[in-house]
C-alpha cells in the first residue's frame, strides 16, 4: 500500500533535519579542540538524541572553552595552572584575583556541603547532587560579582576614573569539579554529568574506583573497576556533553597506584596485577573467615587469623609465581627463561592470564598452580596489587577519552611523578597531566623548604599542567578560625581590629567593605532603576556605617 504524500514528506523532513544536525555535529568535531578525542559513536547517533528544542549554549560550555584555552596555553608555554578547593563564594571571589581555575572538592563537600546536611568522610555516600549544587552555588556567585564589577566600571566617566579602579578582575574563573566514581552505573554517570553541565562546571574528574566501595584517594581499602568499565564511564560523560552541545573538559583519574582490590577480572589488561594463591591446599579465604566469625571470633583475633591465612596462601602475582618456580627448578638457564617470560608478560603488555599460563608451561614444561579466586575477600572482590606502572597502563587506556589524566598517589614523590609522566607520554607525547598537591601528604616531612618552593614548577616541566590542593579551602578556613578564636578569647576586640580588620586595610582586601562586596550598591541600583531613579529604602544611602571606610579602600 503506497504511503500518503503527507506522511512521506514528514519522513523526508525528519531525515533531512537529522542529516543536517549530524553534519553540524561532524563540523564541530572536526575542530582542533577534538584532535586527541576518541568517540565510539557517530554524529548521527548524537543528533537523534538531542530532541527538537533548539540547542542551548550552556554557561558550562562557555566556561569549558575558556578552561581549555587556559590549559592549552599552559601546555604550550610549559607553565602550570595551580588552584585549590574552594569552600564558598568568599573564597572564590578572592581566588579570582590570583588564580586561573577553581577546584571543587568532593571531600570538602562531603564534610561541609552535603545536600542531606549530614557530614561525613569522603566516601561519596552523599546525595549525587551535592557537588553539582556546590558548583552552582559558586558559579552564581561568580556571575554576581562579575555583574557587580561590570556595572561599577561602566559608570566611570573617564579613562582616568577607570584607571583609578585598577585592573578588572576576571571573576568568571572556570570551575573543575569532583565527580567521584559516578555515583552508580552508566545512567547515573549520564545524569551526574548533565547536572554538572547545567550548573556551570567547566570540567569534571572521575576516578576508576567502584562507586559502591569508593574511598578518599588517601584512604586504605581502595577498589578499582576493570579498565574497560571506566572507559565506558568516560565515553558516557563525553556522550552526555555531546548531546548537550558542551565542550566539558574531562579529567580521568586512576586510583590504581595504591589499590588493593578490583571488582572483576574480566579485562585482560588487569590480569598482570591480580593477586593469586600459590598454595593448592588452602581453603577459600571467604569460607575460612565466615567459619571463624560463625565460631564467635572477632576483632584482633580475626585480624590474626587473616594474617595467618595470607601467610599460608603464598599470595603472589603470576609473574612472581613463575619466577619462583623457575628458581626452584633444575634448569640451568634460569635468568634467561625468566627474561623470556617477562619480555612477553609485563605491566604494559596487556597479556591475558590464559596467555601467560600457556607461555609459562612452554618455558617451564609444567603448569603452575595460581588461583585468584581463593583469596577473594568476603565482599567478593579480587585482590589487586597496583603501583605506578599499573597507573601508567590505565592512564594510557583512558587518555583517548579524556583531556587530562591523573594518578592519585600516597606521597609527593617527584621521581614517581616522573615515571608516570614518562610512561604516559611514551605513548601519548602531548597528553596533559594533572597532579593532586594533597594536604594528606606531610609536606614538611616529605621535602625541604627549597624543594617545596619549586615542586609545582618541576612537575610542570614534566607536563603536569593542572595542579591543585584539594582541601586548601578547608584547611585555611580551619587555621584562620582557630587562630582568631584563640586570639579573640584572649585579647577581645584588639584581636579583630588588629589581626583582621587592619590587615584587610593593609592588603586591600575588598571584603573589608562587606556591604559593597555583597552587592548592596548593585542591588540599590536595581531598586532605583525599577522606581524611576529614587529609592527611600536604598541600603547604601546616608547613614550606612560603611562610610567609615571611605579612606581605606
Curated annotation (Swiss-Prot):
Task: Locate the residues binding Mg(2+).
Answer: 178
Source species, please?
Answer: Candida glabrata (strain ATCC 2001 / BCRC 20586 / JCM 3761 / NBRC 0622 / NRRL Y-65 / CBS 138)
Stated EC number for the protein is 4.1.3.1, 4.1.3.30
Pathway involvement of the protein, from the record: Carbohydrate metabolism; glyoxylate cycle; (S)-malate from isocitrate: step 1/2
Principal location listed in the UniProt entry: other
PANTHER family to which the protein is assigned, alphabetical:
BIFUNCTIONAL GLYOXYLATE CYCLE PROTEIN, ISOCITRATE LYASE/MALATE SYNTHASE
Q: Which reaction does it catalyse?
A: D-threo-isocitrate = glyoxylate + succinate; (2S,3R)-3-hydroxybutane-1,2,3-tricarboxylate = pyruvate + succinate
User: What is the name of the protein in this document?
Assistant: Isocitrate lyase
Keyword Lyase listed? The answer is: yes
What cofactor does this one take?
Mg(2+)
InterPro entries recorded? ICL/PEPM, Isocitrate_lyase, Isocitrate_lyase_ph_CS, Pyrv/PenolPyrv_kinase-like_dom, Pyrv_kinase-like_dom_sf
GO cellular component, alphabetical, reads: glyoxysome
Q: What's the name of its gene?
A: ICL1
Signal peptide bounds: none
